[in-house]
Amino acid sequence: MKRLMVFGCLAGALACAACERIAHSEVSQKEEETVVRQGDVVFSLDEVARLFAALPVGEAQVAEVRDAVSASAGNGYDEEYTLQNLFEAPGSGIGSAPATRVEGYPEPLRDLLAAEVRRQYATRAVDPEAFLDALSESDVQLYWPFSEDFTTDEAPIVTFNPGDNASRNIGYIRREDGTIEEIVVDEEMARERPVWVVNRNIDAEYQTLEMRRREDPDWGQGGSILIRSGEGQDTRASGKDFKTLVLRSFKSKRNFDSWLAGGSEVWVKCGAIEDFTASTEAELRLYTPSITDFLIVVRRKDVGKELTFNAVLVSEWTGMLDNCAFMMVEDDGGTQTSWKCSAMVKYNSRSYGFEIEIPLRSRDDIIWRGALTRSYIEKYNGITGHFGDVDLVLELI
């Protein structure tokens, strides 16, 4: 949402479905996933997992993590508990307002963690307080897959995301005598007993549809519109008939990442010329494309399920709009690049393409991209359509 930037210009070309990638020098994806650089402090996810595994986690701490991941899931995110929240507001989830954050944990995880860091790092080169500050300011989090399936307060196995799309990893479990046992952990085990995964958060800075609708009831049912076409004009002033393109439902047919990385963060992006009613060449040049985008988080338990959204993609689709540019990506980070494409309109029996750059990042998995024509949408109006590994129900109403 905040990260989007739009550049619109008039181009007499057909809609483009090609992607232009920009080459960047980057650290390896494995290093980016597993090594954290926070100021002068550098640490690994494995190091953090070992710290959590050493803690005498009991009923109160399990309840704290359960409260946090449940709150995150209720706000449309994955089952996540960021270390920022762990230190600043124990038991709070991503998107939780300060007034709704849970208080009063008798012995929060942050206290146990701080005591363990001070004990282990007392004789190390890294200052314990600097390390704690780095942890609290980082994007590291605890991810508890399938948390809703567990009602007991059994102490968890703690593991971490080793990168490289690994399907299993070493986990650590604390025995009653305080010793740490290593165990191989896979997704099947995470379904059978509590497993906390130390990984990195990539979606906390963005708002899900649930958060948008809750915080701003007047905002509507769609995504974040960055630049509205015909900016400065009174939209709908022409009195022309228009329809609204709505995403009724969404179904992901597979997971796009390893379970150790969490669920799928899917960005839905749509570029179009809203309320296009130009009658002269001069009016034609007043229009600029709009890009609507929003985040859909698909938890692993929801793969294969049809999720209802009723989200607006194009609010004012007039008879002069031929198509829109549409893309879905699964967010995997990397450097900023874009997809150059066009949204087509008809004017005086001629087709014009408005050039659009829809942002994405270099490691994103492109699920589907291309032009959605009005004829296609009307033919399959309200009927499930197949877009790569995702099924959508689109409707012009």
Regions found by a protein language model. Give the residues of each.
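C-terminal motif of bacterial Sec signal peptides marking the signal peptidase cleavage site
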Residues: 15-18
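Acidic/polar, low-complexity intrinsically disordered N-terminal segments immediately downstream
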Residues: 20-240
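Eukaryotic beta-sheet cores, primarily in C2 and C2-like/PH beta-sandwich modules
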Residues: 268, 302-350
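Peripheral membrane lipid-binding modules
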Residues: 275-322
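C2-type phospholipid-binding modules
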Residues: 332-397
